[in-house]
């Protein structure tokens, strides 16, 4: 059976406004944006239609950020999964998802999860604009990142002026015990993507 509070909230919303494009202002969306900013410390919210679109937006933000000094490389982790669009597939660190769909956009590099020396090497090239990672890798298992690796990633991003981006499409919205999984690691990302649990 469904939670009665959830049923009441959904019923109320359906009698008010069932669905509309993100092009139009709606009060519930504004309230949600405010709540997300309050809970995360972020300053802006972008509402899209899917996790892939959220990650695609994060990739664009990183590229725009790096444009000022010709940095366009985005680093993700080996065995990551970031979506099924061409750019998010390029960001996905698994060869099996790359078969049959190339060529991909240039500028994506992969580093092994929990390998601090490899992370240091790739983030110190002067070409990286963003690091996108999942706190728990969910493709092929449930593999949480090592807290020391995550904290070092944040430190390296700050030292090298790289955007730290966290993909919380699978883990966000209370699915790991906190609103977002990154909170359990004591870090403060520049960009957080979310989707499924928010719906």
Where are these predicted regions, by residue range?
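Conserved N-terminal phosphate-binding loop of PLP-dependent enzymes in the Aspartate aminotransferase
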Residues: 1-199
């Amino acid at each position: 059976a469904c939670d009665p509070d959830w049923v009441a909230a959904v019923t109320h919303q359906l009698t008010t406004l069932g669905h509309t494009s993100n092009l139009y202002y709606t009060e519930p969306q504004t309230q949600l944006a405010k709540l997300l900013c309050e809970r995360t410390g972020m300053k802006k919210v972008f509402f899209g239609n899917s996790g892939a679109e959220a990650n695609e937006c994060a990739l664009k933000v990183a590229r725009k950020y790096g444009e000022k000094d010709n940095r366009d490389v985005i680093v993700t982790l080996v065995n990551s999964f970031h979506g099924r669009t061409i750019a998010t597939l390029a960001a996905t660190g698994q060869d099996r998802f790359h078969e049959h769909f190339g060529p991909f956009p240039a500028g994506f590099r992969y580093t092994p999860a929990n390998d601090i020396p490899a992370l240091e090497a790739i983030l110190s090239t002067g070409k990286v604009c963003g690091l996108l990672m999942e706190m728990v890798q969910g493709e092929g298992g449930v593999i949480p990142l090592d807290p020391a690796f995550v904290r070092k990633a944040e430190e390296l991003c700050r030292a090298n002026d790289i955007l730290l981006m966290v993909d919380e499409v699978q883990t966000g919205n209370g699915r790991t015990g906190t609103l977002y999984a990154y909170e359990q690691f004591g870090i403060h990302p520049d960009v957080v993507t979310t989707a499924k649990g928010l719906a």
